[in-house]
Amino acid sequence: MLIIPAIDLKDGACVRLRQGRMEDSTVFSDDPVSMAAKWVEGGCRRLHLVDLNGAFEGQPVNGEVVTAIAKRYPNLPIQIGGGIRSLETIEHYVKAGVSYVIIGTKAVKQPEFVAEACKAFPGKVIVGLDAKDGFVATDGWAEVSSVQVIDLAKRFEADGVSAIVYTDIAKDGMMQGCNVPFTAALAAATSIPVIASGGIHNLGDIKTLLDAKAPGIVGAITGRAIYEGTLDVAEAQAFCDNYKG
């Protein structure tokens, strides 16, 4: 399982939100490229970037920062989400050296777009499913739909999606542990690899995720915990690598 540091971008800075609320943000750095360097030096094998402004506006806003990080680390797999709602945007990021694009809102509102994107950019597409009480949320989590996460995830199995990033909104930024039972259930219900996100606080939470014995869970995204020092990236990755269960 990969430990994936998150860099959330808002107005060009690296921030963390609580439960997806833009008005409840903490700025951790005005230099996201240097922050990326910190996690790379800490031994991370993949980075998770989110354009928060883009998620709300429906198009990239912090794209220059994303491109700068991708150019600085050409051999590091980088995944970007937030405001990706057109093939042109995907093409822009892929050409900039980004490994994966995360389709969220558009995947819910127009699921056929995912198949289209996978066909145009095979191996590059991740679907981001953000949920509240098992129902998918969209538009920067501002809207909660009537669509159930597992039902939607199954729909994408034939499309060639590389992974699903599953975030439990109630847990995100709260550092109270991620929703392990539902994450494991999602991984069991679909053939698509699942990346857990939201709420990881410390090594104990990583162990709980591994103890779920869900082979479909291939990664864990962590944000506030690594910024506030309750989780060390290198230590957590070593723990995953050596985990025997």
From Swiss-Prot:
PANTHER family: 1-(5-PHOSPHORIBOSYL)-5-[(5-PHOSPHORIBOSYLAMINO)METHYLIDENEAMINO] IMIDAZOLE-4-CARBOXAMIDE ISOMERASE. One of its GO terms (cellular component) is cytoplasm. The active site is at D8 (proton acceptor), D130 (proton donor). The keyword Plastid does not apply. SUPFAM superfamilies: Ribulose-phoshate binding barrel (SSF51366). HAMAP family: HisA. InterPro entries: Aldolase_TIM (IPR013785), His_biosynth (IPR006062), HisA_bact_arch (IPR006063), Isoase_HisA-like (IPR044524), Isoase_HisA-like_bact (IPR023016), RibuloseP-bd_barrel (IPR011060). Keywords: Amino-acid biosynthesis, Cytoplasm, Histidine biosynthesis, Isomerase. It catalyses: 1-(5-phospho-beta-D-ribosyl)-5-[(5-phospho-beta-D-ribosylamino)methylideneamino]imidazole-4-carboxamide = 5-[(5-phospho-1-deoxy-D-ribulos-1-ylimino)methylamino]-1-(5-phospho-beta-D-ribosyl)imidazole-4-carboxamide. Pathway: Amino-acid biosynthesis; L-histidine biosynthesis; L-histidine from 5-phospho-alpha-D-ribose 1-diphosphate: step 4/9. The gene is hisA. Belongs to the HisA/HisF family. Its main location: cytoplasm. This is 1-(5-phosphoribosyl)-5-[(5-phosphoribosylamino)methylideneamino] imidazole-4-carboxamide isomerase. It is found in: Cytoplasm. It comes from Pseudomonas putida (strain W619). GO terms for molecular function: 1-(5-phosphoribosyl)-5-[(5-phosphoribosylamino)methylideneamino]imidazole-4-carboxamide isomerase activity. One of its GO terms (biological process) is L-tryptophan biosynthetic process. The keyword Cytoplasm applies. Pfam families: His_biosynth. CDD domains: HisA (cd04732). Its EC number is 5.3.1.16.
